[in-house]
């Protein structure tokens, strides 16, 4: 079954959106496999966003991520990566449709509440980085009501 990495950024944590965001993924039928509340240091944030290191906004992004705790999660389910991106909405909240997390809760691109893996390979890398100890191996009793 496919997995993806989702991170609620410091603004989402500070604004009390953790439960709402988790609820959206659960209500869709995805399974939570890993969850951490963590304050990351600069080196870790730089490693997570290494692919953006040449961008002019890189330092500001790193400062934002280390400014407070984040909630890192691994979600599992059929099509979770693509569907998760749709639930999240466009990177720029002003381009996000109402009903998406960013469309409902964000205005500025620099405070866009949530991060989600954008491809299978980035999901693998991010899960390995944030959850080196692995994730919980379990199956919800609702599985048979969601999947054929």
From Swiss-Prot:
One of its GO terms (biological process) is UTP biosynthetic process. GO terms for molecular function: ATP binding; metal ion binding; nucleoside diphosphate kinase activity. It comes from the Eukaryota. It is an enzyme of class 2 (transferase). Major role in the synthesis of nucleoside triphosphates other than ATP. The ATP gamma phosphate is transferred to the NDP beta phosphate via a ping-pong mechanism, using a phosphorylated active-site intermediate. InterPro entries: NDK-like_dom (IPR034907), NDK-like_dom_sf (IPR036850), Nucleoside_diP_kinase (IPR001564), Nucleoside_diP_kinase_AS (IPR023005). The active site is at 115 (pros-phosphohistidine intermediate). Keywords: ATP-binding, Kinase, Magnesium, Metal-binding, Nucleotide metabolism, Nucleotide-binding, Phosphoprotein, Transferase. It catalyses: a 2'-deoxyribonucleoside 5'-diphosphate + ATP = a 2'-deoxyribonucleoside 5'-triphosphate + ADP; a ribonucleoside 5'-diphosphate + ATP = a ribonucleoside 5'-triphosphate + ADP. Belongs to the NDK family. This is Nucleoside diphosphate kinase.
């Amino acid at each position: 079954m496919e997995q993806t990495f989702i991170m609620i950024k410091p603004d989402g944590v500070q604004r009390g959106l953790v439960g709402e965001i988790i609820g959206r993924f659960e209500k869709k039928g995805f399974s939570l496999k890993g969850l951490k509340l963590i304050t990351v240091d600069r080196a870790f944030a730089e490693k997570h966003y290494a692919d953006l290191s040449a961008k002019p906004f890189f330092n500001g992004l790193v400062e934002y991520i280390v400014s407070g705790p984040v909630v890192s999660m691994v979600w599992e389910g059929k099509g979770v990566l693509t569907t998760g991106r749709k639930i999240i909405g466009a990177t720029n909240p002003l381009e996000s449709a109402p009903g998406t997390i960013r469309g409902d809760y964000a205005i500025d691109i620099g405070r866009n509440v949530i991060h989600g893996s954008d491809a299978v390979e980035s999901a693998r890398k991010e899960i390995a980085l944030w959850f080196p100890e692995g994730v919980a191996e379990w199956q919800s009793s609702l599985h048979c009501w969601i999947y054929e």
